[in-house]
A protein has these predicted regions:
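Short acidic-glycine-tyrosine-enriched beta hairpin
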Residues: 72-89
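A short, N-terminal "cap"/entry segment at the start of jelly-roll beta-barrel domains
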Residues: 1-35, 114-130
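A short hydrophobic beta-strand segment most commonly corresponding to one strand
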Residues: 58, 85, 99-117
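Short beta-strand His + acidic residue motifs that chelate non-heme Fe in jelly-roll/DSBH
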Residues: 48-50, 68-69, 91-98
Length: 130
């Protein structure tokens, strides 16, 4: 058993490399090969690049409204209280809506493979779904 203390006073990481827009990341567990837990805040219009996880991912939305888009290319709106399970190997992206930030806890199982940036057209399709 491990108890991970809160990051009292620690600054959030501004994630840039595989994200579009301003994304704040607070690592919870990052030192395990098989599981990573991050608290993430997406500002409006910010999002991940397309990516997939070896053993899947669980997103628990705790604030705001966002989008998640999977292999079918159909963006879905997610809101506070929603939980998303992303299958192992499923290509996807997630982020804030055009007018709302979105905060979630991401539990990532296994490794992550990052792909291309989400195009403005793909993101605009998400706004149409809203």
């Amino acid at each position: 058993m491990r108890i991970i203390s809160a990051r009292s006073g620690a600054k959030s990481i501004i994630a840039e490399k595989t994200f579009t827009g301003t994304v704040h990341q607070d690592p919870v567990i990052t030192d395990q090969d098989d599981i990573k837990i991050n608290t993430v805040i997406f500002t409006p219009c910010s999002r991940t690049y397309w990516h997939f996880h070896d053993n899947g991912q669980i997103l628990q939305v705790f604030r705001g409204k966002g989008y998640v888009c999977g292999k079918d290319g159909v963006p879905r709106v997610i809101t506070e209280g929603d939980t998303v399970y992303i299958e192992p190997g499923e290509r996807h992206w997630h982020g804030g809506t055009q007018d709302s930030l979105m905060g979630h806890t991401a539990i990532t199982l296994g490794g992550t493979t990052w792909l291309e940036e989400v195009s403005e057209a793909d993101y605009a399709a998400a706004a149409d779904a809203d």
